[in-house]
Amino acid sequence: MITGLVMKSFKSWDQIEIVYQEWGEQTDLPPVVLHHGFVVDANANWVAPGIVDALLGAGRRVLAPDARGHGQSGKPHDPDSYGEQRMARDLAVLLDVTGEPQIDLVGYSMGAIVSLIFASEEERVRRLVVGGVGSGVIECGGVDRRAIPNDTIIEALSVDDPTTLGKSGATSFRVLADALGADREALVAQASSIYRGEIGLNGISARTLVLAGEDDPLAIRPNVLSEAIPDATLMMLTGDHIGAIADPDFARSIVDFLA
């Protein structure tokens, strides 16, 4: 069972409040920073599946922010306040506020894009783990929009009556948002500002692990991504975009790689 949780917050570079959770004691290794995916928050992505427990069991200190527009962090409805580049700047402020000279960084899906951007621009990342992304990072820029077109996600999050939606990947985002009580206007703002540019993957100096579910439509051909990062290893897991996190090897591989 997780113990030692401390909730903290800070005003980011544009005065949006970012809330983060902190567990564990300072060690000789850098803290592990966990960045969650779209719609969910730190609890849903990292606490509930046991990732935080696994890291604490290995003696690590863990920091897990709720991204802007998600969880307990600030939720402006202006699309100009969003995008993974802005979230990467939030990570930089988190390190400045906590005084951490170096971190191990783990990101999933949207959080993987944030983490790749951050690691490509910063030298404060010792080791990097990204999951739930694949060739789309290079071929689309950011999260792969070929499997689930972005406009369908915006529509699914915007309609008043979700029963009018058919079964689709976009509908699953609406179901998840409603289950978590998420601010759908904030999520639409983020979806409207999704990162679409090139990421300087060859500038990533951290040793990197790419994790992908075999049946994840958002992480097709992950070898294309791992081969574009100078010092990267690819590990395949069972399951789709959500199911891969439940694979016991997901948590185990993160702990082992960051040791």
Question: Whereabouts are the PLM-identified features?
Answer:
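Conserved HGGG/HGGXW glycine-rich cap/lid loop of the alpha/beta-hydrolase fold
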Residues: 16-74
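Active-site loop/oxyanion-hole signature of alpha/beta-hydrolase fold enzymes
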Residues: 53-57, 63-102
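Conserved hydrolase catalytic core segment
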Residues: 101-139
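Helix-rich cap/lid subdomain of alpha/beta-hydrolase
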Residues: 130-192
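Active-site nucleophile elbow and catalytic-triad environment of alpha/beta-hydrolase enzymes
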Residues: 185-200, 215-217
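Short beta-strand/loop motif that positions the catalytic acidic residue
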Residues: 204, 210-212
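Conserved alpha/beta-hydrolase "acid-adjacent" motif
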Residues: 217-223
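Catalytic active-site module of serine/aspartate enzymes centered on a nucleophile-bearing elbow/loop
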Residues: 232, 237-259
